[in-house]
Amino acid sequence: VRQTIPGFSLIWIGMAHDYFFWTADADTVRRRMPGIREVLGRWLQQVQVDGSISGMGGWNYLDWLPEWHGGIPPEGVDGGGASFSFMLQLALRQAAELEKHLGEPEMSALFERRANELRIATTRLYWNESRGLFADDRAHTSYSEHAQSLAILSRAAAGIELEQVARGLLAGKGLYRTTIYFTHYLFEAYRMIGGIGQLIHRLELWRQLGERGLKTTIEAPEPSRSDCHAWASHPLYHYFATILGIRPSAPGFQSVEIAPQLGAMKWANGTLPHPRGEIAVEVRQEDDRLCAVVSLPAGSDGVFKFAGTVTPVRAGRQEISVPSRTRRMHSTTRA
């Protein structure tokens, strides 16, 4: 049976973007840029005069919510609705960043312009001022964590709108909740808005898998017999990239940003593979300070960020101690 899921083509662009930053293999991404442009061109053909998306054939699956028939969000049968628009905006911005680094500034500018045009249209169609949230549909009858998370990640929510969306997402009231794989995007949004406490709480689903006799991550909430699904293993990524806060800040992992978020945790440590070796990080809350031990491979450098402080880090082992204080928002260099 032929099965086409258009939204996965946008996720593929995000995977290429991640690969470009996390590995030293730029050539693989360069060879895929024609395909990335083709995917974006196909989606942009479906943008209507009012800025909505329509006419995208296939199975427009987004997430396995029980309330969404076939995993399709409101207004999403033909690729419409807020979430797919935000996904397209995010993919356009990711592609723009790739084009810039790969020497195509004109293509980069084009993709940024189209993302900004969509942002204006999506806000006009889906923003609900009284609720301070983006609706899933133009009738403003449905609201989800999916749309709010993607609005944050795609930079569609900015300024006062970002503050309102962040409050609404952290409160979680009246929102359809993400399920297993899509919670990755929720966790990425939590990272940006200081929601580490909510992130750690939502990990309870994965903690319960062992109690059910499972040794692998499942695709969808019960009842489910898809018992081994790689996309559901993203908490491993978030332990290193969000809790320990280890992320590349330049293509090829040439520079590193370490911005830990422990929440109520007292300590965390881990060792992450790097193109030049390994990055080891240990962080510990001690009274009113955060103490860290960071080891970077030869030829690497970066910064350690915490509670408004920025400390340069270099190759080798170094100890860091900075004052601890609560922050409401956590800014990032990359979506």
Task: Mark where each language-model region is.
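Alpha-helix C-terminal capping segments
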Residues: A166-G172, Y190, V294, V303-F306
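Non-catalytic C-terminal accessory modules of carbohydrate-active enzymes
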Residues: R113, I120, G197-A335
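Charged/polar, low-hydrophobicity segments characteristic of intrinsically disordered regions
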Residues: Q3, L10, Q45-G55, R124-A135, ...
